[in-house]
Swiss-Prot record:
Name by which UniProt lists this protein: Imidazolonepropionase
Positions with a binding annotation for Zn(2+): H73, H75, H243, D318
Gene from which this protein is expressed: hutI
InterPro entries: Amidohydro-rel (IPR006680), HutI (IPR005920), Metal-dep_hydrolase_composite (IPR011059), Metal_Hydrolase (IPR032466)
Amino-acid positions noted as binding 4-imidazolone-5-propanoate in the UniProt annotation, renumbered to this chain: R82, Y145, H178, Q246, S323
The family this protein is said to belong to: Belongs to the metallo-dependent hydrolases superfamily. HutI family.
GO biological process, one term: L-histidine catabolic process to glutamate and formamide
Cofactor binding, note field: Binds 1 zinc or iron ion per subunit.
Organism: Shewanella sediminis (strain HAW-EB3)
Residues noted as binding N-formimidoyl-L-glutamate in the record, renumbered to the chain: Y145, N320, G322
One Gene Ontology molecular-function label: iron ion binding
Reaction(s) catalysed (UniProt annotation): 4-imidazolone-5-propanoate + H2O = N-formimidoyl-L-glutamate
UniProt-annotated binding residues for Fe(3+): H73, H75, H243, D318
């Protein structure tokens, strides 16, 4: 037997449903990698004989291996910051009040319109590096801070370039319908026409997006406007997803589920009718505790209903300058448990197996099984629950991406 590398003296949280133990755990395990994929995984005592002289063998010293983490919802490419709005909120202003007065997303739009692709790339690279050091091997990056054709394309080009020049896999999402720009303040329908008739075809022509998203909320786009954009995107061959039920229950999630959305995100105000719609369509529910925490919200997502109806729960950072300037996936694991009362196993599934499903890459990453891409992390922990329990100590020892050691 000949492999490219073998890992021994490790415990593995495979996160695979085919392994009955919590976390899909295999203790005292071994993992073999060949051509960037997992060639063998199981008990070390059952490891087939192999050529130890020609095969690199890594000893984990009892550490834990998990799938590479997947951050399935970020707005990672942007310029500027909104620290001044942070101060305003602490003085009593609400997120909606700031948005309606021309702040919020619109202030970041101005900064992004003025920034060059090179400047945006460097800003994005630093943020991507920060996530990568915590074990993230796949990330989603949205546009949405252009709200005009050229800047939306610019943001997506930068996201694509980050994917080409970084070991982290990048999935891109077109979010032209993120907010109504000031120049269309009294004519939202015309802006929706622009998104559908001009922006979307340009995005498709340059192959800049894997999916499309809309912010469906009272301060943004109605359910009817949202459906128009998502339908056009789906017809153009993109996956679809949605920001929904963050501030109120408009029924956007049920509509998106009917259209076959990969995920609906935020969903603090989602009701049981919406949860049932997600369950029936196989749509994931993406939980964003960073925004919940940073905005000091009090309405929790319907976790018990999601469990009851077996909706896959995803956990993501929502990293952005306004409502979640928290560039840490490990922090989200902790917040998912402490704020939303997920179990540590649910939280880790939300950043591995279920996150892969939300991005449509579940056949390639998210669990550790034979044939899957060899994306995994080695952690200095004694139990997988420790990833959610503790935060701030550098527990990520090594990261393997497609069989290559990329972080030590």
């Amino acid at each position: 037997m000949s492999w490219d590398q073998v890992w021994i003296d490790v415990n593995v949280a495979t996160m695979s449903p085919s392994v009955s133990a919590p976390y899909g755990a295999i203790t005292d395990a071994a993992v073999a990698v060949e051509k960037g994929r997992i060639a063998w995984i199981g008990l070390r005592s059952e490891l087939p004989e192999f050529d130890v002289l020609s095969t690199p063998v890594y000893r984990g010293k009892g550490a834990w291996i998990t799938p590479g983490l997947i951050d399935a919802h970020t707005h990672l490419v942007f310029a500027g910051n909104r620290a001044n709005e942070f101060e305003l909120r602490l003085q009593g202003a609400s997120y909606e009040e700031i948005a309606r007065s021309g702040g919020g997303i619109i202030s970041t739009v101005k900064a992004c319109r003025e920034a060059s692709e090179g400047e945006l790339f460097e800003l994005g690279r630093k943020r991507l590096n920060a996530l990568a050091k915590e074990g993230v091997t796949t990330v989603e990056i949205k546009s949405g801070y252009g709200l005009e054709t050229e800047t939306e394309l610019k943001l997506l080009r930068v996201a694509r370039e980050l994917g080409k020049h970084h070991h982290v896999d990048v999935k891109t999402t077109f979010l032209g319908a993120h907010a109504i720009p000031p120049e269309y303040k009294d004519n939202a329908e015309t802006y929706v026409d622009l998104v559908i008739d001009e922006m979307l075809p340009a995005v498709i022509e340059e192959n800049l997006a894997d999916a499309a998203d809309v912010f469906c909320e009272n301060i943004a786009f109605s359910v009817e406007q949202t459906e128009r954009v998502l339908t056009a995107a789906k017809d153009a061959g993109l996956d679809i997803k949605l920001h929904a039920e963050q501030l109120s229950n408009l029924g956007g999630s049920a509509m998106a589920a009917r259209l076959g959305a990969k995920s609906v995100d935020h969903i603090e105000y989602l009701d049981e009718t919406g949860v049932k719609a997600l369950s029936q369509s196989g749509t994931c529910a993406t939980l964003l505790p960073g925004a919940f925490y940073f905005l000091r919200e009090t309405q929790m997502p319907p976790i018990e209903l999601l469990r009851k109806h077996k909706v896959p729960m995803v956990l993501a950072s929502d990293y952005n300058p306004g409502s979640s300037p928290l560039c840490s996936s490990l922090l989200m694991l902790n917040m998912g448990c402490t704020l939303f009362r997920l179990t540590p196993e649910e939280a880790l599934a939300g950043m591995t197996r279920n996150a892969a499903k939300a991005l449509g890459v579940e056949d390639n990453v998210g669990v550790l099984e034979v044939g899957m891409q060899a994306d995994f992390c080695l952690w200095d922990i004694t139990t997988p629950a420790q990833l959610s329990y503790s935060y701030g100590v550098g527990v990520c020892l090594e990261v393997v991406k497609s069989g290559q050691l990329v972080h030590q």
